[in-house]
Amino acid sequence: MKVFAHRGFSGRYPQNTMLAFQKALESGCDGIELDVQLTKDGEVVIIHDEYLDDLTDFTGNVRDYTLGELKSCNAGGKWREVYGFQPIPTFEEYCEWASGNSLITNVEIKSSVYYYEQLEKKT
């Protein structure tokens, strides 16, 4: 049996952030499940929902912002006051980090509201 950290160590840290992924690694899990979305300029970012309102300090949809714009978005969610600014990571940033450890990664492609034709090819 393998134990996966859902959205990283999301029970104690802001979900789908590099902090949550690092803490999941430190906890000894076997893998990480994460969610991806596509930005306005075609970059793959790690965030659960298509919309930003619930988990960030931005409003609207991920697909309406460029990566540059989203880099100033705080994905700290309910943990903002505890952990400060937590940027939305790119899938590339995650892959670079994950290449240095032995975690298994389960990528969930989110498309319940919008279909992203290129998302599968980019992940």
Each model region followed by its residue ranges:
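Phosphate-group recognition and catalysis centered on beta-loop-alpha active-site segments
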Residues: 1-123
